[in-house]
Amino acid sequence: MSDSPTTAHTRLELPIDIIRIQALLPHRYPFLLVDRILELDQKQKRIVAQKNVSINEPFFQGHFPEHPVMPGVLIIEALAQAGGVMTQLNLSHNGHSSLLFYMVRVDNARFNKQVVPGDILILDMTMKRRIRNMGCYYGEARVNGEVVACADIMCAGVKS
């Protein structure tokens, strides 16, 4: 894996920080769920990202106030966003960065353990295949090396 992946417009050094992530994803607070990119292997089509889970997350106000737990659907969304960063880097490298990707399918989702404030969620996404404007990914979310959630995720690109 290279420590300095390149795109058509800029040279990126790992880790990729939140400012660069915001340049690649359309999401913003409170729905931007990726804080840092730790690893990027464009040959293996794999990315590892980080989400720092804070008690200040708005979803903890109602899920659940007395026992805050990160909703599983948001863990899946965080995985999809990590995959989105990888896809956007690949597209911008190939001159096709005008697509906006939407999650269109989730299969085989499993939630093995709760994610709570203070956890560091590691998001590991691998692109399994790409068919035209569709990307199929497998993702695992880990806390302290333990898989807390996993899923097969499909996203579709639409011209923005």
From Swiss-Prot:
It is an enzyme of class 4 (lyase). CDD domains: FabZ (cd01288). It is found in: Cytoplasm. The keyword Isomerase does not apply. The keyword Cytoplasm applies. It comes from the Bacteria. The active site is at residue 63. Keywords: Cytoplasm, Lipid A biosynthesis, Lipid biosynthesis, Lipid metabolism, Lyase. InterPro entries: FabA_FabZ, FabZ, HotDog_dom_sf. It holds the Pfam family FabA. NCBIfam families: fabZ, PRK00006.1. Belongs to the thioester dehydratase family. FabZ subfamily. Involved in unsaturated fatty acids biosynthesis. Catalyzes the dehydration of short chain beta-hydroxyacyl-ACPs and long chain saturated and unsaturated beta-hydroxyacyl-ACPs. PANTHER family: 3-HYDROXYACYL-[ACYL-CARRIER-PROTEIN] DEHYDRATASE (PTHR30272:SF1). This is 3-hydroxyacyl-[acyl-carrier-protein] dehydratase FabZ. The gene is fabZ.
